[in-house]
Curated annotation (Swiss-Prot):
Region (Disordered): 30-52
Gene Ontology biological process terms, A to Z: proteolysis; respiratory system process
Span of domain Peptidase M13: 99-775
Lumenal face residues: 83-775
Transmembrane intervals: 62-82
Protein name: Endothelin-converting enzyme-like 1
A GO molecular-function annotation: metalloendopeptidase activity
Topology relative to the membrane: Single-pass type II membrane protein
Lineage, top ranks: Eukaryota, Metazoa, Chordata, Craniata, Vertebrata
An example Gene Ontology CC term for this record: plasma membrane
Enzyme Commission no: 3.4.24.-
Summary of the knockout phenotype: According to a report, mice die of respiratory failure shortly after birth. According to a second report, mice exhibit perturbed terminal branching of motor neurons to the endplate of skeletal muscles, resulting in poor formation of the neuromuscular junction.
Family membership: Belongs to the peptidase M13 family.
Cofactor(s) needed for function: Zn(2+)
């Protein structure tokens, strides 16, 4: 779904040299020999006839031709030997001089692959450990990180590039936005000024919200004037803090040509509702740590009766958790069932304890009519929220809303607040050491000036040539999906036609949005003040301007070419309500993609990610949307029932995987597992198409593996990763992706071409007889 704006090989081909022999009926004059051939002392045609009888001239000519042919064969053999066996073989053969880009890239690729492998492990028993065992042995998780993997290493490279760009002087070419992002970055680094201010910036925000306990006893000053709607406006419309529910502007799922206001369940601080329910020892520990965190922040902000306040706010959040529905519940995954478009007048009747027209008028600076339509995505939840408002003391409601604002902004305060946040994160996820300040500030620059920073990034680190090559790779993989659709035996003709139409209409965005090349267009995204000495105020200015941009969209025409993430993002995504795939420049970097790598590695690396995102258009979530991005059931009942049966096979497969005594939830991870499996197949068959069109690739120097095997190794090495044990608990609980080990094993074991490439015996762990397959 689209979020509100305010809130992420080529070779030197063998050149055949055609040498022309002029030996013929006219004699041997002018014979041309390739360079390096020794030239004989042959006699001229005018020599003594007695030394060269007439009948032997043909023999001499024939002999010369044979000598020439033998010499030519010797040269060709030498060239091929250099190409295939010499140190430059991986780089395109003997024609590639020492130090040429292809040779260096191939050598780098070979070193990377071989260092990550553990050849002592049978790939047919545990392909992940075979492909990643060497990497796992050699790497530890940095103290300030929860995880570390091969993709994270690309992120480190991108971060270093961004830091260097931000460290440059503010002057020079570029628009105001580039100067602002550098000033913002410096303001974030200025901890001396941040420490000097201490809690003061947050205390001013709390005062703006009415202070603590304003909704208390009637004899308190201001108690009679307390208005929940005004405080909700402050929280949601000024500070962008979701409280009780969320208000966003997004594409209308049933009419993606227009924007609509969406109201949904929200307002919890912890990342998953079940953490509030303390159903196991780990969630009990996290809940206890959260209570300590609340008390610590409340004390830092001068609140009284800290334990009581913390307990009351926590109990209110627990009530919200009890009436919320998990994001992985069938009720949430079925978008059509959740979608409920109502008028403002109807909304007021459904949820009567809020003044909806007044609230939306204030946030959107509009005068909405009672007939204005909004989309309610959690009708039952919102009805229960209305009852919760009625039954909860005003003082507790007020403190909860103020707390939600505090949680959103406290990371931008002085060291005591940051230390409290780190202690909570340490208990939840296990990171021992806080992130270094420069990384924190780079993250904030990405969040608040993503496109401005992206303009700097793509100018120096992503070429138009790379963009064109990746676009061609995407088209090859799309072509394969079109073929696969035709070959499916479980999908009828009517559904195939709709699936092909969706593929044809799918938009593909690669690298960066074109407006980044125009400084004045980038400047319009950041028309707010930034000063080097006012970091907290810079944050507030950014939040308020982002809200303005978001609310203005409600009356604007939809631009389906807009991007959700900036180009430096180390990510890729598919948006079903736009039918749009996006591959930012940040992920199109070595080792996922390198134009000089063998194509087996590019298709196994970035190609499987492209196939993954493409398959999302046809998984259990994306498959609910049609070619225009509208929520519309385009399947026949017969085809859809076949799809569900095939999907259930994948659910059962992943339900059998466990990590740290936690069972992977096959239903939670279904969409990502379908995409992993489908993406692997599409990329593999696209690579086979490339080989048919360009010819087999040359062996990678000093590696004994075929390029089909290297394709699968590259895929697996995308997901070489280490996680802290505490973070695995949250991953299994909240992540829609299966743990990386099982992303690899689940995908390759269900693909017959993998077993064929590695000669895996039938019914070995990586080549079971019965396989799950959708696409």
């Amino acid at each position: 779904m689209e979020a509100p704006y305010s809130m992420t090989a080529h070779y030197d081909e063998f050149q055949e040299v055609k040498y022309v022999s002029r030996c013929g009926t006219g004699g041997a004059r002018g014979t041309s020999l390739p360079p390096g051939f020794p030239r004989g002392s042959g006699r001229s045609a005018s020599g003594s006839r007695s030394g060269l009888p007439r009948w032997n001239r043909r023999e001499v000519c024939l002999l010369s031709g044979l000598v020439f042919a033998a010499g030519l064969c010797a040269i060709l053999a030498a060239m091929l030997a250099l190409k295939y066996l010499g140190p430059g073989a991986a780089g395109g053969g003997g024609a590639c001089p020492e130090g040429c880009p292809e040779r260096k890239a191939f050598a780098r690729a070979a070193r990377f692959l071989s260092a990550n492998l553990d050849a002592s492990i049978d790939p047919c028993q545990d392909f992940y450990s075979f492909a990643c065992g060497g990497w796992l042995r050699r790497h530890a998780i940095p103290d300030d990180k929860l995880t570390y993997g091969t993709i994270a290493a690309i992120g480190e490279q991108n971060e270093e590039r961004l830091r260097r760009l931000l460290a440059r002087p503010t002057g020079g070419p570029g628009g105001a936005a580039q100067r602002k992002v550098r000033a913002f970055f410096r303001s974030c680094l200025d901890m001396r000024e941040i420490e000097r201010l201490g809690p003061r910036p947050m205390l001013e925000v709390i005062e703006d919200c009415g202070g603590w306990d304003l909704g208390g006893a009637a004899d308190r000053p201001g108690a009679a004037r307390w208005d929940l709607n005004r405080l909700l406006y402050k929280a949601q419309g000024v500070y962008s803090a979701a409280a009780l529910f969320s208000l966003t502007v997004s594409l209308d799922d049933r009419n993606s040509s227009r924007y609509v206001i969406r109201i949904d369940q929200d307002g919890l601080t912890l990342p998953e509702r079940t953490l509030y329910l303390a159903q196991d020892e780990e969630s009990e520990k996290i809940l206890a740590a959260y209570r300590v965190f609340m008390q610590r922040l409340l004390r830092l902000l001068g609140a009284d009766a800290v334990e009581q306040k913390a307990q009351e706010i926590l109990q209110l959040e627990q009530r919200l958790a009890n009436i919320s529905v998990s994001e992985y519940d069938d009720l949430r995954r079925d978008v059509s069932s959740a979608y409920n478009k109502v008028t403002l007048g109807q909304l007021q009747k459904i949820i009567p304890h809020l003044q909806w027209k007044w609230l939306l008028d204030q946030i959107f600076q509009e005068d909405f009519s009672e007939e204005e339509e909004v989309v309610l995505l959690a009708t039952d939840y919102m009805q229960q929220v209305s009852q919760l408002i009625r039954s909860t003391p005003r003082r507790i409601l007020h403190n909860y809303l103020v707390w939600r604002v505090v949680v959103v902004l406290s990371e931008h305060l002085s060291s005591p607040f940051r230390e409290a946040l780190h202690e909570l994160a340490k208990e939840m996820e296990g990171n021992d050491k806080p992130q270094e300040l420069a990384r924190v500030c780079l993250g904030q620059a990405n969040r608040h000036f993503g496109m401005a920073l992206g303009a700097l990034f793509v100018h120096e680190h992503f070429s138009a040539a790379s963009k064109a090559k990746v676009q061609q790779l995407v088209e090859d993989i799309k072509y394969i999906l079109g073929q696969r659709l035709e070959e499916l035996d479980w999908m009828d003709a009517q559904t195939k036609a709709a699936a092909r139409a969706k593929l044809q209409y799918m938009m593909v965005m690669v690298g960066y949005p074109d407006f980044l090349l125009k400084p004045e267009a980038v400047d319009k995204e950041y028309e707010f003040e930034v000063h080097e000495k006012t970091y907290f105020k810079n944050i507030l200015n950014s939040i308020r301007f982002s809200i303005q941009l978001s609310v203005k969209k409600i009356r604007q025409e939809v631009d389906k070419s807009s991007w959700l993430l900036p180009p430096q993002a180390l990510n890729a995504y598919y948006l079903p309500n736009k039918n749009q795939m996006v591959f930012p420049a940040g992920i199109l970097q070595p080792t996922l993609y390198d134009p000089d790598f063998p194509q087996s590695l590019n298709y196994g690396g970035i190609g499987t990610i492209i196939g993954h995102e493409l398959t999302h258009g046809y998984d259990d979530w994306g498959g609910q949307y049609d070619r225009s991005g509208n929520l519309l059931h385009w399947w026949t009942e017969t085809s859809y029932s076949h799809f569900l049966r095939k999907a259930e096979c994948i659910v059962r497969l992943y339900d059998n995987f466990t990590v740290y005594n936690q069972r992977v939830n096959g239903k939670h991870t279904l969409g990502e597992n379908i995409a992993d499996m489908g993406g692997l197949k599409l990329a593999y068959y696209a690579y086979q198409k490339w080989v048919r069109e360009h010819g087999p690739e040359h062996p990678l120097h000093r590696l004994k593996y075929t390029h089909n095997q290297l394709f699968f190794i590259a895929f697996a090495q995308n997901w070489c990763i280490k996680r802290r044990s505490q973070s695995i608990y949250l991953q299994v609980l909240t992540d829609k992706h299966a743990p990386e080990h099982y992303r690899v094993l689940g995908s390759v074991s269900q693909f017959e071409e993998f077993g064929r490439a590695f000669h895996c015996p039938k019914d070995s762990p990586m080549n079971p007889v019965h396989k799950c397959s959708v696409w």
